[in-house]
Amino acid sequence: MGFPKEGEKVQIHSYKHNGSIHRMWKETTILKGTQSLVIGANDRTVVTESDGRTWITREPAICYFHENYWFNVIGMLREEGVYYYCNLSSPFAYDSEALKYIDYDLDIKVYPDMTYTLLDEDEYEKHSQIMQYPPVIDTILKRNVAQLTQWIHQRKGPFAPDFVDMWYERYLMYRN
């Protein structure tokens, strides 16, 4: 597996455990790309859902992917502050087509005051049975929910003060 280069524009593909496509982001600019970490940014990019419907993101977003964690984090810059959407997912993979991961349903929404809500537990339970997630996946995801909430409390990684703003400033260099 290679890794995307700084300044490169890539697609992001989200899959379900059974291999079906879940969602695709048309264009994300790579701000940092290494074997273990990818930070990207997009703004008003086209998103295609599994049923073919499309929509356009409303605000600039900084995306954080790490090979050692079963989650990715999207920091969205809004007038009221930075909102985060955290997907519990497999670690990322990258090939010539796109940056890819498996979405495992659970999400954490983090508000500008760093309060958060765990979302889609019912969807996780349903898909866990339908797609027969192995027990090890449940164990890994629970451990990563704990890791993610610890990072939120500690303002670590993508939740660190100024993380999103710093990477957004870098993104602006590629847009102009």
UniProtKB/Swiss-Prot annotation:
Swiss-Prot/TrEMBL catalytic activity: a ribonucleoside 5'-triphosphate + H2O = a ribonucleoside 5'-diphosphate + phosphate + H(+); a ribonucleoside 5'-diphosphate + H2O = a ribonucleoside 5'-phosphate + phosphate + H(+)
UniProt cross-references to Gene3D superfamilies, sorted A to Z: FomD-like
Active-site residues, as the UniProt record annotates them: R23
Residues that, per the record, bind Mg(2+) 1: N87, D103, D107
Pfam family, one: DUF402
E.C. code: 3.6.1.15, 3.6.1.6
SUPFAM superfamilies: FomD-like
Domain of life according to the entry: Bacteria
Cofactor(s), names only, from the UniProt record: Mg(2+)
UniProt-annotated binding residues for Mg(2+) 2: D105, D107, D120, E123
Any GO molecular function: nucleoside diphosphate phosphatase activity
Disulfide bonds listed in the record: none
Keywords carried by this UniProt record: Hydrolase, Magnesium, Metal-binding
Record's function text: Has nucleoside phosphatase activity towards nucleoside triphosphates and nucleoside diphosphates.
Membership in a protein family: Belongs to the Ntdp family.
Annotated protein name in UniProt: Nucleoside triphosphate/diphosphate phosphatase
Organism per entry: Bacillus anthracis
